Amino acid sequence: MEVCITNFGGRIVSVMVPDKDGQMRDVVLGFDSIQDYISKPSDFGATIGRYANRINQGQFTLDGVEYQLPRNNYGHCLHGGPQGFQYRVFDAALLNPQELQLTYRAEDGEEGFPGNITCKVLMKLTDDNAIDIQYEAETDKPTIVNMTNHSCLL
């Protein structure tokens, strides 16, 4: 198995596995060039955050404070807003040939969310040909966070 990841959006851009004839085939949906990921908005393979899924009417209340987020999906906030993590550049550190750590720092108020936050995504290719993804977030004040990966398998 071969996995290709870009730091633009923390995206898995290809997963090559052998087919029944031993030919390597890509099994994730995506584009052929980084320029396509930049110019054609999509979530293909991306790390989604600060908050994956929809937030109703782009509003939430935390510790008695109401927050209004951008409404980018039929009146709701989807996947962290129009400039969510999927459109950000992560710092990348190759820990070893099987492990990559991606880090993104979002400032207080980015896309309307409270708190400075440092998010880490550890992607590991396991010995049994699985991709293990672990998420970690540290913040300096109460906030909401719900990260995921948006790879679509063929």
Regions from the language model: what does each represent?
Residues M1-L154:
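Surface-exposed acidic/polar loop and edge beta-strand patches at domain peripheries
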